[in-house]
């Protein structure tokens, strides 16, 4: 069985999303959980890449890093005002179910 996608949630993502993913057996870390609170976006993205985790964020700065050519393990991006927690959770579960880490590498999924 291929390796599943793993996620890293930045500090602005609601903790209920991490809880929902974990309840479904999906590997997820959070900024607070790995002591990266206050880290720069570049440091967050480097951590996620080193751990082969897709970065989940609403922060446009990650899109700019992608445009600048900064390598990453994938970005799942959404605007918080456009999606409910349940919608974001369902979208991440779908990404986890149908995409591989290789398919997400240096790719952005807009939720």
What are these regions (language model features)?
Residues 1-11, 15-24, 36, 42-45, ...:
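Acidic, PIN/NYN-like endoribonuclease modules and their adjacent C-terminal/linker elements
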Residues 49-66:
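Acidic, metal-binding active-site segment of PIN/NYN-like and related structure-specific nucleases
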Residues 27-35:
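A short beta-strand-loop structural module common to alpha/beta enzyme folds
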């Amino acid at each position: 069985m291929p390796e599943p996608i793993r996620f890293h949630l930045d500090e602005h993502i609601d903790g209920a999303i991490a809880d929902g993913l974990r309840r479904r057996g999906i590997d997820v870390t959070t900024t607070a959980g790995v002591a990266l609170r206050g880290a720069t976006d570049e440091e967050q993205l480097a951590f996620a890449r080193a751990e082969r985790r897709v970065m989940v964020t609403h922060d446009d700065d990650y899109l700019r890093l992608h445009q600048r050519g900064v390598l990453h393990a994938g970005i799942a991006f959404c605007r918080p005002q456009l999606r409910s927690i349940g919608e974001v959770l369902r979208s991440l579960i779908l990404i986890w179910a149908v995409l591989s880490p290789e398919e997400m590498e240096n790719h952005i999924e807009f939720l």
